[in-house]
Amino acid sequence: MGQKVHPNGIRLGIVKPWNSTWYANTKEFADNLDSDFKVRQYLKKELAKASISRIVIERPAKSIRVTIHTARPGIVIGKKGEDVEKLRKTVAEIAGVPAQINISEVRKPELDAKLVADSITSQLERRIMFRRAMKRAVQNAMRQGAKGIKVEVSGRLGGAEIARPEWYREGRVPLHTLRADIDYNTSEAHTTYGVLGVKVWIFKGEILGGMAAVEQAEKPAAQPKKQQRKGRK
């Protein structure tokens, strides 16, 4: 029986960046890893309704920088930045070093695998039919410009006695092509019948140029300078 490798793990360093980017010696590594885990756990619990896509952690010179990618930045920031300041203080306490929190807005949540998976799970928990939720997610992604998408839901679908998986795919999702930009993520729906697992693969196109091209695309675009017109004398 063919098993699939994790689409993000196999592309790390090729077209996918790491979620934690720091270096540490042998003594500090375990502590840093543990505090990363606790910071992520705290932020996911605290910002459960803020549509969090991913949390990137950097550690420059005895401090911690956390970048939260979210579709709803207003909820994270709060009124006059009160909420984000509270998050910063708690993250600094957990990590034991000064903290900085940056917010990055996800422009197209329909093309983000984590947000799509969370959207499907919230619909399943509200007792919406799983086929309708899957089809809606696929149609929205294709409408926003995805080259392909696959959605799989597994568990006691519709309250059935025997658990089974069902999937729906549109377009192409090339899992073996390493330069393919495939966003993959999972989520869980807790229903009265038990837990339903949701997996989402979104193919956004091929990245030519490797990590250099990815890093260039993630940088904010520089605004072109306005040229001053020389007046006629």
Curated annotation (Swiss-Prot):
Instruction: List, alphabetically, the GO terms of the cellular component aspect.
Output: cytosolic small ribosomal subunit
Q: Which CDD domains match?
A: KH-II_30S_S3
InterPro entries reported in the protein's UniProt record: KH_dom, KH_dom-like_a/b, KH_dom_type_2, KH_sf_prok-type, Ribosomal_S3_C_sf, Ribosomal_uS3_bac-typ, Ribosomal_uS3_C, Ribosomal_uS3_CS
One Pfam family per UniProt: KH_2
Keyword GTP-binding listed: no
Top-level taxon: Bacteria
Q: Which residues form the signal peptide?
A: none
The record ties this protein, via SMART domains, to:
KH
Keywords associated with the record: Ribonucleoprotein, Ribosomal protein, RNA-binding, rRNA-binding
Q: Which residues cross the membrane?
A: none
**Function description:** Binds the lower part of the 30S subunit head. Binds mRNA in the 70S ribosome, positioning it for translation.
Entry similarity comment: Belongs to the universal ribosomal protein uS3 family.
Quaternary structure (record): Part of the 30S ribosomal subunit. Forms a tight complex with proteins S10 and S14.
Protein name in the entry: Small ribosomal subunit protein uS3
> What species is given as this protein's source?
Photorhabdus laumondii subsp. laumondii (strain DSM 15139 / CIP 105565 / TT01) (Photorhabdus luminescens subsp. laumondii)
